[in-house]
Amino acid sequence: MEQLSSANTRFALDLFLALSENNPAGNIFISPFSISSAMAMVFLGTRGNTAAQLSKTFHFNTVEEVHSRFQSLNADINKRGASYILKLANRLYGEKTYNFLPEFLVSTQKTYGADLASVDFQHASEDARKTINQWVKGQTEGKIPELLASGMVDNMTKLVLVNAIYFKGNWKDKFMKEATTNAPFRLNKKDRKTVKMMYQKKKFAYGYIEDLKCRVLELPYQGEELSMVILLPDDIEDESTGLKKIEEQLTLEKLHEWTKPENLDFIEVNVSLPRFKLEESYTLNSDLARLGVQDLFNSSKADLSGMSGARDIFISKIVHKSFVEVNEEGTEAAAATAGIATFCMLMPEENFTADHPFLFFIRHNSSGSILFLGRFSSP
C-alpha cells in the first residue's frame, strides 16, 4: 500500500505545483486521489509509448501490481462502518455502436468497480451528457451538478471516463458555533476580506518548521481515520503570501517529514480557522501534458489498443471538478473527498491563527493517501 500512496502523493504534489504555476496566488482545490484512480483505469487500456508516459507521470512505474493495489486501497478507504462518509465511484460511458474489448471491461469492473454504460453519443450527445451529469450529481450528493458543460461531448465522442469522490466528515472536536466571529482575512500585504472565523482551544498535534517559519496543525475527524492537515506560514513574507517558500520545497519526503506524528507535539492550541467553501473546475489536458502525458490526447499517437482493437480512440478531455466546505461541524468535500483538557497554569500553548493564506490536505491516515489537496487564498 505504501508504494501506491507514495506514487499518488508524488503525483498530487506535481499536479498541485503545475496548477500553482498557472495560478500563483489564487485558490486551488483538487482530489489527486480521484484523478490518479481515473487515470489508472485509462492505464489498463493503454499500450506502448502512451502507457509509458502515463506510468512515468503518475509514478505507477514505482508500484508493483498497481491495479490490485488500487483495488485494496479503494476498499480500505471506502470501507463500511467508518465514522465518515466517503464515496469513490467510477463509471465508463461508451458509444453504444463502438466495440470495447471484453477483457478491458472485465478488468475495469473487477479492479475499479466501473461498469460500462452504453450511451448514444453519435445521435444524442446532449442526452448522453445529461445522463452522465445526473449520475455524478447523485454520487456527490448534489454538490457537483454539472461535471460536463454544454458542448463538452459531441457525436465523435467514443468514451467518457468518470470518477467522482464525495467526503463528509465531522471533526473529532467540533468548533462551537457561538465562538465564531467576523474577522479579517489578509489576502496579501494590502488587501483584506471579512470571514467567519471559527475558534476552539484544545489539544492537537502541532508542529513548527523552523527553516520555513511555518506552523503545522492536524485536525482529526471523528474516528481519527482521516485528518485535515494545515500548513500555515508565520506571516505574509513574500510578495504573495509566505506560501511561495513552502511550495518551492514541497516534495513527498519533506511533506512526510513535516507532518509525521512523531515530529508533532500534542499540546494545547488556540485554533482560529475560517469557515470556507471552494468549488473549482479544471480541464487537465495541458497540465498533464506538461507533466509528460502527451500521446494520450493526440488522435494520431494515442495507443489505447488495450481498450479496443481499433487504433481510432484517444482521450479528448480530462475534466475535474471539486467542492469542499469546512464549517464548525466538520468538512464536506466532493470531487468529480479525546483529549480531556485539564487546567494547568504552566501548560505551554500555541496559537494557530489562519487569518492569511494556507495549504491544506485531507489524508487517509493508515495508508497516508492524500484524498484532497488545496490552497485557501481568498474567501
UniProtKB/Swiss-Prot annotation:
Residues with the N-acetylmethionine modification: M1
Family matches, as InterPro entries: Serpin_CS, Serpin_dom, Serpin_fam, Serpin_sf, Serpin_sf_1, Serpin_sf_2
Site (Reactive bond 1): F343, C344
Modified residues (Phosphoserine): S300
Tissue spec: In human bone marrow, present in all CD45+ populations. Expression levels are highest in the neutrophil lineage, intermediate in monocytic, and lowest in lymphocytic lineage. Within the neutrophil lineage, expression is highest in promyelocytes.
Cellular component GO terms held in the UniProt record: collagen-containing extracellular matrix; cytolytic granule; cytoplasmic ribonucleoprotein granule; early endosome; extracellular exosome; extracellular region; extracellular space; membrane
UniProt keyword annotations, A-Z: Acetylation, Cytoplasm, Endosome, Lysosome, Phosphoprotein, Protease inhibitor, Secreted, Serine protease inhibitor
Family membership noted in the UniProt record: Belongs to the serpin family. Ov-serpin subfamily.
Subunit structure: Monomer. Interacts (via C-terminus) with CASP1; CASP4 (via CARD domain) and CASP5; these interactions regulate the activity of inflammatory caspases. Interacts with PRTN3. Interacts with GZMH.
Name of this protein: Leukocyte elastase inhibitor
UniProt organism field: Homo sapiens
Gene name for this UniProt entry: SERPINB1
